[in-house]
């Protein structure tokens, strides 16, 4: 009797699955806290980028209790460079909720009540933590499903179709290993470019294997990102200290430290500033930001809330990648602890 696609994939995974720091061996018990941290970090971020951050984070916060009790700025400091800082704040809040209620969520309804957890993260967490029959979908899975069934319409138009086919394929007896297996298939074999179709365990089922446009599947047609212009200011006092401010706890880059900046090119200070003729470009999820860099040397404190700190002490404060790029553009290196 012919094996099912899920069984074939599980056999392939047993021999070829990736060794990742948040994974256990096939069939072993999984720590739900470990999965929770990894799932938050993996939202919109590649496995390769996450691994070093995950290792440092787990060393600093080995238990959910230690994370729940932590100061948010300590968490931000470990998150620096990973981006999407709202995830760090949401993970902290979720850890506090779980510790307070005394249990990890074991149903989709329970998981969706937690901050920062949507339907895809909920499915991954439940499947990987408790081997529950949830359908896991990430970028790798979307690519595999679209190619397997030759789905060429824009992803936004066929989301429900992708989810239905992914659910149909999911192994109900071993959803945890199946989830890891299909994600690994996309990461190792059914890659965005140069997919290795000849050694794919699902080759005989794939409706796109002979396509000349395989690398264009899935169809990720999107509108071009809106561009915004602005100015950022590196302000020094007579001692050479640099002025920093802290963002509010809501919105873009919330809770992080930064150099004063504005989303327009109108000067925001009454004192004289110098245009360095340098600028940086940073891409966010929905727009691209171009910032011109200005410097100033002043005697008094600027007309906004903030503080002067010695440049070498900048490493003590959580800064976004955007602000580090600004500093490095002028000073070559951002201080490290």
Regions found by a protein language model. Give the residues of each.
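Intrinsically disordered, low-complexity, charged terminal extensions of DNA damage-control enzymes
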Residues: 1-24, 28, 187-337
């Amino acid at each position: 009797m012919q094996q099912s696609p899920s069984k074939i994939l599980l056999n392939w995974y047993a021999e070829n699955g990736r060794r990742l720091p948040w994974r256990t061996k096939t069939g072993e018990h999984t720590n739900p806290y470990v999965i929770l941290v990894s799932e938050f970090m993996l939202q919109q971020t590649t496995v390769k980028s996450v691994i070093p951050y995950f290792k440092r984070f787990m060393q600093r916060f080995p238990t959910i209790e230690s994370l729940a009790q932590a100061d948010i700025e300590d968490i931000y400091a470990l998150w620096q460079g990973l981006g999407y800082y709202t995830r760090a704040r949401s993970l902290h809040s979720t850890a506090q909720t779980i510790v307070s209620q005394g249990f990890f969520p074991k149903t989709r309804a329970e998981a969706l009540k937690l901050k920062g957890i949507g339907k895809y993260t909920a499915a991954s967490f439940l499947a990987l933590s408790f081997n529950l029959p949830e359908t896991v979908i990430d970028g790798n899975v979307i690519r595999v499903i679209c190619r397997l069934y030759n789905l060429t319409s824009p992803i936004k138009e066929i989301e429900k179709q992708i989810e239905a086919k992914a659910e149909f394929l999911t192994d109900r007896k071993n959803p945890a290993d199946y989830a890891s297996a299909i994600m690994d298939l996309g990461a190792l074999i059914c890659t965005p470019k140069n997919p290795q179709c000849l050694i794919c365990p699902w080759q005989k089922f794939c409706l796109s294997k002979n396509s000349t446009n395989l690398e264009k599947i899935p169809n990720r047609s999107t509108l071009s990102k809106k561009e915004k212009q602005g100015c950022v200011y590196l302000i020094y006092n007579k001692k050479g200290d640099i002025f920093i401010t802290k963002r509010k706890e809501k919105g873009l880059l919330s809770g992080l430290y930064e150099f004063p900046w504005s989303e327009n090119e109108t000067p925001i200070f009454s004192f004289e500033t110098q245009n360095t003729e340098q600028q940086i470009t940073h891409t966010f999820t929905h727009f691209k930001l171009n910032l011109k860099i200005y410097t100033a040397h002043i005697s008094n404190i600027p007309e906004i809330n903030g503080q002067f700190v010695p440049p070498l002490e900048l490493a003590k404060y959580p800064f976004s990648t955007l602000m580090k790029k600004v500093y490095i553009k002028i000073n070559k290196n951002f201080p490290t602890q």
